Amino acid sequence: MTISISDLRKDYRQQSLSETEVDPNPLQQFQTWFKQAIEAEILEPNAMTLATLSREGKPAARIVLLKEVDDRGFTFFTNYKSRKGEELAHDPWAALVFWWAELERQVRIEGSVSQVSAADSDRYFSSRPWGSRLGAWASEQSKAITGREVLEQNLRALEQEYRDREVPRPPHWGGYRLSPTLIEFWQGRPNRLHDRLCYRLQGDQWQLERLSP
């Protein structure tokens, strides 16, 4: 059976999005949508695409998990020596995208990124499962290795080392917070005439505008 990619399409008809319905604060609006994504039992609603830039201006994107959102922004955790960590150290601006297909919704976010405090990183790290804490030590993220056995050998050694004591947070592992300057809410609509409401930070105030699809 031959599948024509160009024929793959879906007409979105679930909901609409109007300026009169949304919260004047986009972070509060995100919280509303995020709660609805959880209630819809979407698989990993906190999964988001993180896009960064290399020194040469080449983009890279990957899925990471949102671990906290508040009025300060969107927090995730990773290895500071990974490719994304190195790129954020060079250019601390990034973009996030959430895609909730079951709700026919997308949220796009742009902003500056900074490391969270060591205390915040310690607090989250200590909440992780034991194996995940060991994994943060076992893997030199984004580095080439000769085979999976390297990781498994590292893990076995760490299991012995920390069998009877707490696993500390590696100094090269911790959190980042993206402080948004732009948040766009996208709701799929019929005939590709989607609703797009975009908040832009002007000074300390959020300005809302509708974008043409």
Curated annotation (Swiss-Prot):
Catalytic reaction equation(s): pyridoxamine 5'-phosphate + O2 + H2O = pyridoxal 5'-phosphate + H2O2 + NH4(+); pyridoxine 5'-phosphate + O2 = pyridoxal 5'-phosphate + H2O2
Enzyme Commission numbers on file: 1.4.3.5
Pfam families in the cross-refs: PNP_phzG_C (PF10590), PNPOx_N (PF01243)
Cofactor note: Binds 1 FMN per subunit.
Coiled-coil region list: none
Gene Ontology BP, a term: pyridoxine biosynthetic process
InterPro entries: Pyridox_Oxase, Pyridox_Oxase_CS, Pyridox_Oxase_N, Pyridoxamine_oxidase_dimer_C, Split_barrel_FMN-bd
Domain of life: Bacteria
Cofactor(s) listed: FMN
Pathway stated in the Swiss-Prot or TrEMBL entry: Cofactor metabolism; pyridoxal 5'-phosphate salvage; pyridoxal 5'-phosphate from pyridoxamine 5'-phosphate: step 1/1; Cofactor metabolism; pyridoxal 5'-phosphate salvage; pyridoxal 5'-phosphate from pyridoxine 5'-phosphate: step 1/1
Gene3D superfamilies: Electron Transport, Fmn-binding Protein, Chain A
Gene Ontology MF: a single term: pyridoxamine phosphate oxidase activity
List of residues binding substrate: 9-12, 67, 124, 128, 132, 192-194
Binding site for FMN: 62-67, 77-78, 83-84, 106, 141-142, 186, 196
Keyword annotations: Flavoprotein, FMN, Oxidoreductase, Pyridoxine biosynthesis
Entry-linked PANTHER family: PYRIDOXINE-5'-PHOSPHATE OXIDASE, PYRIDOXINE-5-PHOSPHATE OXIDASE
Function field: Catalyzes the oxidation of either pyridoxine 5'-phosphate (PNP) or pyridoxamine 5'-phosphate (PMP) into pyridoxal 5'-phosphate (PLP).
Complexes and interactors: Homodimer.
Family according to the record: Belongs to the pyridoxamine 5'-phosphate oxidase family.
Name of this protein: Pyridoxine/pyridoxamine 5'-phosphate oxidase
Organism: Cyanothece sp. (strain PCC 7425 / ATCC 29141)
Lineage of source species: Bacteria, Bacillati, Cyanobacteriota, Cyanophyceae, Gomontiellales
Gene field: pdxH
